[in-house]
Design a protein with these regions (language model features):
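C-terminal outer-membrane beta-barrel translocator/porin domains of Gram-negative envelope proteins
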Residues: 8-11, 15-127
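Transmembrane beta-strands of outer-membrane beta-barrel proteins
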Residues: 28-32, 69-73, 134-138, 163, ...
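C-terminal hydrophobic structural anchor segments
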Residues: 122-156
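Strand-connecting loop/turn motifs
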Residues: 24, 61-65, 128-132, 164-170, ...
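Active-site lining segments that contact anionic ligands and/or coordinate catalytic metals
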Residues: 101-103, 114-118, 128-134, 155-159, ...
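Short small-residue beta-strand/loop micro-motif enriched in glycine and branched aliphatics
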Residues: 38, 144-145, 170-172
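Outer-membrane beta-barrel "beta-signal"
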Residues: 162-169, 173, 182-194
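Single conserved hydrophobic/aromatic residue that forms the stacking wall/gate
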Residues: 1-6
Length: 194
């Protein structure tokens, strides 16, 4: 599949650190138009995607923080190519696919319907120096029709993890569960995420 995309991204970030921030807000909104000849896609109308990511850090004390987040992606048009479908899984945005949304409890990539929205809440405790424990819960909903999103299929999941903020980046181990798998999931990260 040969395609080209025209996109526009708005980013605003006031987080004090990239990893384990203590305060701040992150907001990103993006729009992409996908074509194969700058006019059409596969001889028909092009399709597009709208994305939104919001996260804030609410410090409860000098060691304990609450991190609510809300994010989603909507595909517009009926001719969406498989490589651009919505995907969830893992701990970070865009880990394996540029449009991948994180979801605690799902460590692999899953393809979802044309509209997906996720609400996530993390409770992070710094236990000593650069050591952190994070409890994450998230709920998502997806449907092919954005206007009937609330009638879509539900996703839920959660994880509990330990991380050390090293000079080589975060070293972490996480255990998670979701309604999309029947076994406890394990994820390990060794260093910076590129």
């Amino acid at each position: 599949i040969k395609s080209s995309a025209a996109s526009d991204v708005y980013k605003r970030q006031t987080l004090d650190r990239r990893y384990f921030p203590n305060r701040g807000v992150s907001l990103e909104a993006d729009y992409s138009l996908y074509t194969d000849n700058f006019v059409k896609y596969n001889g028909r109308s092009p399709f597009s995607a709208i994305g939104l990511k919001f996260m804030t850090v609410c410090p409860i004390s000098s060691r304990l923080s609450l991190l609510p987040a809300f994010y989603g992606r909507v595909l517009i048009g009926g001719n969406t190519a498989f490589p651009f479908l919505n995907a969830i899984g893992g701990e970070t945005f865009g880990r394996y696919l540029s449009q991948q949304l994180p979801f605690a409890g799902i460590n692999h990539v899953e393809i979802l319907d044309n509209s997906v929205v996720v609400a996530r809440l993390q409770l992070r405790q710094r236990i000593a120096g650069n050591n952190y424990i994070t409890l994450t819960g998230n709920y998502g909903i997806h449907n092919n029709d954005f206007f009937h999103l609330l009638e879509g299929k539900s996703l839920w999941g959660g994880s509990l993890g330990y991380a050390y903020n090293s000079i080589a980046g975060p070293l972490s181990a996480t255990f998670g569960m979701s309604n999309r798998n029947s076994h406890l999931q394990f994820y390990m990260n060794l260093g910076f995420m590129f």
